[in-house]
UniProtKB/Swiss-Prot annotation:
This is 6.7 kDa chloroplast outer envelope membrane protein. It is found in: Plastid, Chloroplast outer membrane. Keywords: Chloroplast, Membrane, Plastid, Plastid outer membrane, Transmembrane, Transmembrane helix. Residues 41-62 are cytoplasmic. It comes from Spinacia oleracea (Spinach). It is a single-pass membrane protein. Its main location: plastid. GO terms for cellular component: chloroplast outer membrane. Coiled coil: none annotated. The chain crosses the membrane at residues 18-40. Residues 1-17 are chloroplast intermembrane.
Length: 62
């Protein structure tokens, strides 16, 4: 007789399964974000990869 895993039918099993699914979805979303950062930046209009420190410098209005 072959041993087959039973589906989670208890509240504890269901909560654990839901936590695993949410964790996997979050990890997948994060991986996609990291993988496509250069593409997302170009689509948003930040096509230049060069850092311009003068643009981010604080200049008070006096």
């Amino acid at each position: 007789m072959e041993s087959v895993a039973k589906p989670a039918t208890t509240k504890e099993g269901s909560a654990k399964q839901a936590a695993i699914v949410v964790g996997v979805l979050a990890l997948g979303w994060f991986a996609i974000q990291v993988a496509f950062i250069p593409l997302f930046n170009k689509v948003r209009g930040g096509g230049s990869d060069k850092k311009d420190d003068d643009v981010n410098a604080f200049t008070p209005d006096t």
